[in-house]
């Protein structure tokens, strides 16, 4: 039966059998949320109820009484084998106590207790991502738990992202094409971005004819991605690369057509916080296309503006306004918005320096950004010389 039903019966009758039934009832869908539930659960806890302590901790955390929740869950961890207790403790250790090693140990314990739990595995990976663990280590763990990956689109997308970061473009593409994705709130555009990156990576290693076909393929999303293009996605990077290939062939008419398509869009440098913000690399490719079209002064002005933005905003104190638009990342573990802004400004500086021909400055800016976020895709590609 429902655990809470038996806890209330125990409170009213004092019948120990009701406490036994409450403690042995399935816990999966028990979510105490009312103030009177606190009384019933506290009574059970005072008489040795271990699962009651777990439920009470969940309710108290929701009421911002996290210190009491921590004490209850740490008591539970000594007495019952429930992975969620350790998972919940990881939230306290990281978000409230700012103790990343302790949080990671708790998440590892939770996953070790049930290695079939794809959600806990994903959350463990997100903790490592948040704390800037090397992406190669995360990829190895993914490859050790491949049966879990297709169970969650967010987890599978993270795996494909790591494959692209590692330069395994063919494997990333194959994984994308053999899975049917379902977009989630805030995750819009994530898997199409990896689809495009995989094809762009394959194009860079191919002969010109094959590269052109791959880039043109990337302009259209297959049905299994589950979504179309976001408003404002102008494929500046793809068209700029296509233009370069046509120019290399000497086909100036098609090159100019591609460069004009690449040069479209507003030049509005922002913090790129939300999923539908214009990525700065797209504005970089638009500026490159302008240069290819002979509009050198405007291109140089835009490249310089990237650097000006970085220098003006790298020390900004960032805040999020939760209204209408979802954030692109899963935020169970609290991120550092100011760190994200510093990394973003490193990318801005690197893009501007690349455009102005200062490759060493671009590389140094990218390395500074990677020191704080080693999984940033564009910074990795700048360091590798393949943006």
Predicted regions and their residues:
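Short coil turns that delineate tetratricopeptide repeat
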Residues: 1, 46-47, 80-81, 115, ...
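Hydrophobic/aromatic packing residues within the alpha-helices of TPR/SEL1-like helical repeat arrays
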Residues: 41, 73, 107, 142-143, ...
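TPR alpha-solenoid repeat register
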Residues: 3-5, 52, 85-86, 120, ...
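Structural motif corresponding to the intra-repeat A-B loop/turn of tetratricopeptide repeats
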Residues: 16, 63, 96-97, 131-132, ...
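Residue at a conserved register position within TPR or TPR-like alpha-solenoid repeats
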Residues: 13, 60, 93-94, 128, ...
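Flexible helix-coil transition and linker loops at the boundaries of alpha-helical arrays
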Residues: 37-47, 144-149, 181-192, 222-232, ...
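"A position-specific structural signal for the A-helix of alpha-solenoid helical repeats
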Residues: 8, 55, 88, 123, ...
């Amino acid at each position: 039966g429902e655990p809470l039903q038996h806890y209330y019966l125990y409170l009213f009758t004092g019948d120990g059998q009701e406490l036994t039934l409450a403690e042995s009832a399935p816990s999966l869908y028990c979510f105490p949320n009312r103030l009177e539930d606190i009384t019933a659960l506290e009574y059970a806890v005072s008489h040795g109820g271990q699962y009651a302590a777990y439920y009470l901790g969940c309710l108290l955390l929701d009421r911002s009484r996290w210190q009491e929740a921590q004490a209850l869950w740490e008591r539970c961890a000594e007495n019952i084998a429930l992975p969620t207790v350790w998972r919940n403790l990881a939230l306290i250790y990281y978000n409230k106590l700012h103790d990343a090693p302790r949080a990671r140990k708790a998440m590892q314990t939770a996953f070790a207790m049930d290695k079939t739990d794809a959600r806990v595995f994903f959350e463990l990976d997100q903790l490592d991502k948040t704390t800037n663990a090397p992406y190669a280590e995360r990829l190895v763990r993914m490859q050790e738990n491949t049966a879990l990956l297709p169970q969650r689109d967010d987890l599978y997308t993270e795996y494909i992202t790591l494959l692209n970061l590692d330069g395994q473009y063919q494997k990333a593409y194959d994984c994308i094409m053999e899975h049917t994705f379902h977009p989630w709130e805030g995750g819009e555009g994530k898997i199409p971005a990896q689809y495009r990156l995989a094809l762009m990576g394959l194009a860079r290693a191919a002969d010109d004819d094959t590269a052109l076909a791959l880039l043109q393929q990337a302009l259209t999303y297959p049905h299994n991605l589950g979504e179309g293009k976001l408003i404002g996605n102008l494929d500046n990077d793809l068209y700029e690369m296509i233009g370069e290939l046509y120019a290399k062939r000497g086909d100036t008419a098609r090159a100019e057509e591609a460069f004009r398509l690449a040069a479209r869009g507003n030049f509005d440098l922002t913090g790129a916080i939300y999923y539908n913000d214009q990525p700065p690399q797209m504005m970089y490719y638009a500026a490159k296309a302008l240069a290819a079209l002979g509009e050198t002064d405007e291109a140089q002005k835009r490249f310089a503006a990237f650097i000006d933005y970085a220098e003006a905003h790298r020390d900004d104190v960032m805040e999020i306004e939760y209204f209408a638009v979802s954030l692109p990342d899963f935020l169970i573990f609290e991120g550092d918005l100011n760190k994200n802004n510093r990394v973003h400004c490193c990318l801005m500086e690197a893009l501007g320096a690349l455009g102005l021909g200062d490759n060493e400055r671009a590389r140094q800016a990218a390395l500074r950004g990677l020191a704080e976020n080693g999984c940033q895709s564009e910074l990795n590609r700048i360091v590798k010389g393949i943006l």
